[in-house]
UniProtKB/Swiss-Prot annotation:
Functional note: Catalyzes the transfer of endogenously produced octanoic acid from octanoyl-acyl-carrier-protein onto the lipoyl domains of lipoate-dependent enzymes. Lipoyl-ACP can also act as a substrate although octanoyl-ACP is likely to be the physiological substrate.
InterPro entries reported for this sequence: aa-tRNA-synth_II/BPL/LPL (IPR045864), BPL_LPL_catalytic (IPR004143), Octanoyltransferase (IPR000544), Octanoyltransferase_CS (IPR020605)
Name listed for the protein in its UniProt record: Octanoyltransferase
Localization annotation: Cytoplasm
Biological source species: Geotalea uraniireducens (strain Rf4)
Site annotation Lowers pKa of active site Cys: residues: 130
Length: 214
């Protein structure tokens, strides 16, 4: 498992890196990889999302091949793009989504934040609102895209969309939950330290692959 910190990187550039890594994983020539990064301000909308949920187009918009509706990415938000071979981990997308939720809940618990899943809604929540968004794309059982955890994010751009298609959805950040300064480098380190071991526990590698399909 490779864990790569890309720092602050343009969305399109990060997407190209994901595509290359996914092709290598599918071909068997590359390792599973977790990309950790931040984006300049951008709205992304899933393949089945409604552009009517974007109320202000002053920020760039990208329609992408993931599940979910519209969300915001910007500085202070930890974005994780795992490129994972689900064909070797049971071909269970729903369990993979639960893995990401559980991982993020463990990470924020390190900062004494009690987070939870909301029935029927993908993501990580607190009593104050949505703390992390999750949207995954899968092709031939190799994953792209992933999660966006609000750490020190300016939450104002969320007021100009219906986050994940939900009008009036409250959004929060780790900094707001803690009530003080949170360092991005510490959050990245905790995600990176937990990711591989927890994935292997949650979705162990298997010797054989199921039919990937297309």
């Amino acid at each position: 498992m490779n864990i790569i910190d890309l720092g602050l990187i343009d969305f399109d550039e990060a997407y190209s890196i994901q595509e290359r890594l996914a092709a290598e994983v599918f071909a068997g020539s590359g390792a599973e990889t977790l990309l950790l990064l931040e984006h300049p301000p951008v709205y992304t909308i899933g393949s089945g999302g409604d552009e009517g949920n974007i109320l202000d187009t002053a920020i760039e918009v990208r329609r992408i091949n993931r599940g979910g509706d519209v969300t915001y990415h910007g500085p202070g938000q930890l974005v994780g793009y795992p490129v994972i071979d689900l064909a070797r981990r049971g071909c269970d997308l729903h369990r993979y989504l639960r893995f990401i939720e559980e991982l993020l809940m463990l990470v924020v618990a390190d900062f004494r934040v009690a987070a939870f899943r909301s029935p029927g809604r993908t993501g990580v929540w607190t009593d104050q609102g949505k703390l992390a968004s999750i949207g995954v794309g899968v092709r031939r059982w190799v994953t792209m895209h992933g999660f966006a955890l609000n750490v020190t994010t300016d939450l104002t751009p969320f007021t100009r969309i219906n986050p994940c298609g939900m009008a009036g959805c409250p959004v929060t950040s780790l900094e707001a939950e803690v009530g003080g300064n949170v360092k991005m480098i510490e959050v990245k380190a905790r995600v990176g330290a937990r990711f591989e071991g927890f994935l292997d526990e949650f979705m162990p590698l298997r010797d054989s692959e199921k039919d990937r399909g297309f």
